[in-house]
């Protein structure tokens, strides 16, 4: 079958990256920026809130082991898609909930997935996740890649990232590495 790539933003990319790396079938996760207008932004640029970009991850996965919907299921489990421009302690448009489909099929599948969650009243509030076609993905600097793996004892990681990783292990145990 091959590999596919999903691009998702659900708050700080360190959290989303670490959660996605737990899934068996994920072959690579890259933190970066997308959804804005500034070419080749830096972390500082994106944190200023003026670029229009969100912190996102690109998740490459083996389609023999995972479906796009599996990736979406984990994504919607590890962040709150009902808060506008916020995830946990992180506030600003760069932390918005966003799915950036790579093609029309992913767009249809993401829209259907969100519609199913909404119909099932899966969350206490309305889902505010944006679904916008991916135009350009800009990888973040190397120091942001595999951040949790490199800094597991950093305060932000112990308070914010580790609980999301634990949640993936608990809820998706059979599908984790």
Curated annotation (Swiss-Prot):
GO terms for molecular function: L-methionine:thioredoxin-disulfide S-oxidoreductase activity; peptide-methionine (S)-S-oxide reductase activity. It is an enzyme of class 1 (oxidoreductase). Pfam families: PMSR. Keywords: Oxidoreductase. The active site is at 12. One of its GO terms (biological process) is protein modification process. It catalyses: L-methionyl-[protein] + [thioredoxin]-disulfide + H2O = L-methionyl-(S)-S-oxide-[protein] + [thioredoxin]-dithiol; [thioredoxin]-disulfide + L-methionine + H2O = L-methionine (S)-S-oxide + [thioredoxin]-dithiol. Its EC number is 1.8.4.11. The keyword Oxidoreductase applies. InterPro entries: Met_Sox_Rdtase_MsrA_dom (IPR002569), Met_Sox_Rdtase_MsrA_sf (IPR036509). It comes from the Archaea. SUPFAM superfamilies: Peptide methionine sulfoxide reductase. Has an important function as a repair enzyme for proteins that have been inactivated by oxidation. Catalyzes the reversible oxidation-reduction of methionine sulfoxide in proteins to methionine. Belongs to the MsrA Met sulfoxide reductase family. This is Peptide methionine sulfoxide reductase MsrA. The gene is msrA.
């Amino acid at each position: 079958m091959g590999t596919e790539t999903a691009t998702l933003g659900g708050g700080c990319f360190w959290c989303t990256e670490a959660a996605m790396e737990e899934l068996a079938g994920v072959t690579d996760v890259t933190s970066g920026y997308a959804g804005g207008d500034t070419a080749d932004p830096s972390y500082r640029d994106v944190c200023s809130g003026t670029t229009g970009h969100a912190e996102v991850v690109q998740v490459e996965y083996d389609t023999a082991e995972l479906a796009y919907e599996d990736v979406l299921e984990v994504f919607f489990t590890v962040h709150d898609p009902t808060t506008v421009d916020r995830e946990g302690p992180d506030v600003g448009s760069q932390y918005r909930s966003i799915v950036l489909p790579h093609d029309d099929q992913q767009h249809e599948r993401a829209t259907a997935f969100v519609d199913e969650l909404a119909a099932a009243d899966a969350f206490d509030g309305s889902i505010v996740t944006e679904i916008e076609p991916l135009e350009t993905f800009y990888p973040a600097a190397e120091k942001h890649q595999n951040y949790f793996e490199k800094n597991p004892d950093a305060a932000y990681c112990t308070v914010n990232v580790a609980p999301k990783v634990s949640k993936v292990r608990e809820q998706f145990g059979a599908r984790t590495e």
